[in-house]
Swiss-Prot record:
This is Cellulose synthase catalytic subunit [UDP-forming]. It catalyses: [(1->4)-beta-D-glucosyl](n) + UDP-alpha-D-glucose = [(1->4)-beta-D-glucosyl](n+1) + UDP + H(+). The gene is bcsA. GO terms for biological process: cellulose biosynthetic process; UDP-alpha-D-glucose metabolic process. It comes from Komagataeibacter xylinus. Residues 147-240 are annotated as: Catalytic subdomain A. Catalytic subunit of cellulose synthase. It polymerizes uridine 5'-diphosphate glucose to cellulose in a processive way. The thick cellulosic mats generated by this enzyme probably provide a specialized protective environment to the bacterium. Binds c-di-GMP with a dissociation constant of 30 uM. Substrate binds at D236, D238.
Length: 754
């Protein structure tokens, strides 16, 4: 009896057919040409308003139906659909809304149109960059350790405090790599004796530089000439590496000799000003997550990963092939990567955080850092434009172009915010369109842009927060943008201040006064519009009524964004010098020394940490309440297969939660604390532990942030932190045991190689 063959699945047949068609000579060009013709036809076909409304409604329904999928093809389809809707909007704007009565009206209208063209250009480039994120996985190193390369770890510093730098140095000394194949260097542009002495004490090497020319790039170039490792790991002086950094990130460099750079994410264990100051900040992804979670991963597909200045491994041969780090701009990192790629080198990105640093503490500092970034990227755009010159593929050119021109955002952002004032103050209607036409063209364009971004960005960036980030800095960056475009050689490298405390809550007027003035003007314009609609409604012509209505709605949206940006300036107290990091680590707590045996501890009690810091640790454990005074203890843990034992003092214990402070009295203990807090291989794997974006929820969170602007002093932080659930401990307190200081029941504790 013949065997019955099962039918070939329809999807498989379709795939086979499409593959056969595309395998024909010239098929890709034919399909591309047909697709382009279809796109042009779809975006330029003339429809009545009612027909366009039907098309817009169908596109929205298609989005909701297709958007339920999770595949990469679904994302690409939604991006193409969004681009199609946006191109129809652009066609409408160019052909039907530029009907101006005066030169002033025409000038204002064209200015708005240019801002919209920039926004659409950035939208399409973002779709191009993220069309196929690579999601590169770590590659194993050779089995034979003798085949592992030599590595120089550079930690450049200029005027940062030793208390910050020493943590990074100790973390670097603890990286799991053959001791004879790694050297840790403090690159001190300040030539400070205490740094040199610390290097001697801890086992690091010290390179001082007197002239400080070319800032960080000059410091790195100075060190390259005095070192010889095959690879260079660069860490900003506050970026503390995990123990597994090199073993996770080095495999690709060893396997592929063409890779010049392996970049990893910049993760921050302290909150940035937006997270710390806004009411819902702790439930919102950090500003940098979009770049390191989505954009860099997309750039990697196009072989266009940028060097970000830290948390990156570079091949010495590649750096030397371009004459060292670029010194022509204040963003030496991106410029260096561009120069290497022009020489034919590849770059790579690994979306695994293997180091963590301090975010900018104050809004003023944050804006200053972004001003430097904007100046540097615009400088590169002027002096080494990626669209000109040789050595780059088209995908690389577009990715670099997107990065550089993204810092032009300040001028379009101000134009978008201020545009409704043209009518509310001066009666200049700069978009000649009825509300029905806006509903048919503009609203679908905005819907698809926002909704598609939410699908692509998931939990890496929430809707409407980009507008707040940009608005916070826009009025400061306008001047920088114009001056740098005109005079690219102007400007100098500014070191971003890190670390510090804020004793009292305060309002940062210096960082918010432009937006306060802007919001006041916007409020006045909105009141004028509402007054006209309320008291002169019957006297207004039909077109004037519609214009007032649209511009009042626009002004309200602008005002919401401005108020959210102003709310960031309400600086909350930061009295802890040591930032707490949420971490759940199984530990065993050994109680006070036995009488007459000062180095012997007893009563082993298991527990689970809640949060850790360089100052101490909070542990959930079955322990009686303690309120009579400090209790000497030792905290034992197993980290990455190795045991660690740290002396600590219990300050209090209540309801099963004990609070300890470290007895940090020597360098070896500090080394162990750094490893316990920052050096765990899995320390930052939950860096994107945020829910996927939902635009309406995100909008609501912005409104809550504005409400918090008017909160009573000191009230915000109590309500903004997400509440932690108590950890369930399925353990009981053990019978008394004893342990010698520096040992465990299994034997002597081994420390990280230094």
């Amino acid at each position: 009896m013949s065997e019955v063959q099962s039918p070939v699945p329809a999807e498989s047949r379709l795939d086979r057919f499409s593959n056969k068609i595309l395998s024909l000579r010239g098929a890709n060009y034919i399909v591309g040409a047909l697709g382009l013709c279809a796109l042009i036809a779809a975006t330029t076909v003339t429809l009545s308003i009612n027909e366009q409304l039907i098309v817009a409604l169908v596109c929205v329904l298609v989005f909701f139906i297709v958007g339920r999928g999770k595949s990469r093809r679904t994302q690409i389809f939604l991006e193409v659909l969004s681009a199609l809707v946006s191109l129809r909007y652009l066609t409408w704007r160019l052909t039907e809304t530029l009907d101006f009565d005066t030169w002033i009206q025409g000038g204002l209208g064209v200015t708005l149109l240019m801002a919209e063209l920039y926004a659409l250009y950035m939208l399409f480039l973002s779709y191009f960059q993220t069309i196929q994120p690579l999601h590169r996985a770590p590659l194993p190193l050779p089995d034979n350790v003798d085949d592992w390369p030599t590595v120089d770890i550079f930690i450049p510093t200029y005027d940062e405090q030793l208390s910050i730098v020493r943590l990074t140095v100790l973390g670097a000394l603890g990286i799991d790599w053959p001791p004879d194949k790694v050297n840790v260097y403090i690159l001190d542009d300040g030539v400070r004796p205490e740094f040199e002495q610390f290097a001697k004490d801890c086992g690091a090497l010290y390179i001082g530089r007197v002239d400080s020319s070319h800032a960080k790039a000059g410091n790195l170039n100075h060190a390259i000439k005095r070192t010889s490792g095959d690879y260079i790991l660069i860490l900003d002086c506050d970026h503390i590496p995990t123990r597994a950094f090199l073993q996770i990130a080095m495999g690709w460099m060893v396997a592929d000799r063409k890779i010049a750079l392996m970049q990893t994410p910049h993760h921050f264990y302290s909150p940035d000003p937006f997270q710390r100051n806004l009411a819902v900040g702790y439930r919102t992804p950090p500003e940098g997550n979009l770049f390191y979670g989505v954009i860099q991963d997309g750039n990697d597909f196009w072989d266009a990963t940028f060097f970000c200045g830290s948390c990156a491994i570079l091949r010495r041969e590649a750096i030397e092939s371009i004459g060292g780090f670029a010194v022509e701009t204040v963003t030496e990192d991106a410029h260096t990567a561009l120069r290497m790629q022009r020489r034919g080198w590849s770059t790579a990105y690994l979306r695994i955080p293997v180091a963590s640093g301090l975010a900018t503490e104050r809004l003023t500092t944050h804006i200053g850092q972004r001003m430097r970034w904007a100046r540097g990227m615009i400088q590169i755009f002027r002096v080494d434009n990626p669209m000109l010159g040789g050595g780059l593929k088209l995908g690389q050119r577009l990715c670099y172009l997107s990065a550089m021109t993204s810092f032009f955002f300040a001028i379009p952002r101000v134009i978008f915010l201020a545009s409704p004032l043209a009518f509310l103050f001066f009666g200049q209607n700069i978009i000649a369109a009825s509300p029905l036409a806006v509903l048919a063209y503009a609203i679908p364009h905005m819907f698809h842009s926002i909704a598609t971004a939410a699908k692509v960005n998931k939990g890496w960036r929430y809707s409407f927060w980009s507008e707040v980030y940009e608005t916070t800095m826009a009025l400061f960056l306008v001047r920088v943008t114009i001056i740098t475009l005109m005079f690219p050689s102007k400007g100098k490298f500014n070191v971003t201040e890190k670390g510090g405390v804020l004793e009292e809550e305060e309002f940062d007027l210096g960082a918010t006064y432009p937006n306060i003035i802007f919001a006041g003007i916007m409020t006045l314009g909105l009141l004028i519009g509402l007054f006209e609609l309320t008291f002169h409604f019957n006297q207004l012509a039909g077109i004037a009524k519609r214009a007032y209505l649209l511009n009042c709605i626009w002004a309200m949206i602008s005002l919401i964004i401005l108020l959210a940006a102003i709310a960031v300036g309400r600086e909350t107290k930061q009295v802890r010098y040591n930032h707490r990091v949420e971490a759940h680590i199984p530990v065993t707590v050994y109680e006070a020394p036995v009488a007459g045996q000062p180095n012997t501890y007893h009563n082993a009690t298991p527990g689970m940490t809640q949060d850790v810091s360089m100052g101490g640790v909070a542990v959930h454990m079955p322990w009686p309440d303690v309120s009579t005074g400090p209790v000497k203890t030792r905290i034992h843990a197993v980290l990455d297969g190795e045991e660690i034992d740290i002396p600590a003092t219990m300050l209090r214990c209540k309801n099963g939660k004990a609070v300890f402070t470290w007895d940090n009295n020597d360098l070896d203990t500090e080394r162990d604390i750094v490893r316990f807090v920052f050096g765990r291989a899995d320390a930052w794997l939950q860096w994107n532990n945020y829910e996927d974006d939902r635009p309406l929820r995100s909008l609501w969170s912005l409104l809550l942030s504005i409400k918090a602007l008017f909160r009573k002093k000191g009230k915000m932080m109590a309500n903004s932190r997400p509440k932690r659930k108590p950890l369930a401990l399925p353990v009981e307190r053990r019978e008394p045991t004893t342990i010698q200081s520096g040992q465990t029941q299994e034997g002597k504790i081994s420390r990280a190689a230094s």
